[in-house]
């Protein structure tokens, strides 16, 4: 009887622990995958230096955006829908990373999302035969490395999207940390050295180089909807409305000496 009672008490605990996630992949995977892609894109970019002050901004924006995606995926109450959304988002992002790298290495510039969308039809119909041998195959090592997170997302999908969904406090924690990373990165970029590249003088080429691909895509969409910020006017420190009461000093004219 004692052994049966022990089995009854131990069986529910085993069932409960088996349904728990075996690791923090349900919220760590997307920040790690996004940071991996950003660092990979930066490492293969021969036109920019890897270790610069902007590396901090790239890391902050990547972690913030990755935690945001983890939050969105964990908001799905159905595991199947969350799995499909996570794989689809990772696949689309991977394709964008590969396309931007090919544009950077072949055309020497990162292209805007709108330009890539408009150019996609021309590439396939116009010179699609030359894309594979001239653009894709020489950059195959980068493309294979870029698809590593997608392969892991498919293989580890049961550990990334677990049966037990996150609770409210866990989701709130993700939101706070996401806003913390994003807020620090935005503050450093907006009021730092690269203020002009982050605001009124933003371009995709400089944006990806200084802030990362995910931050550049976010800024491009934001400025397309709300417009670019206006540049700051220089502060002259003088007020033209206040009259100048300084007495005028005149030099007396003495004929024969001032000529």
Short names for language-model regions:
Residues 2-7, 12-225:
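Transmembrane and membrane-interface helices of multi-pass
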Residues 207-259:
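Soluble catalytic regions of membrane-associated enzymes that act on cell-envelope
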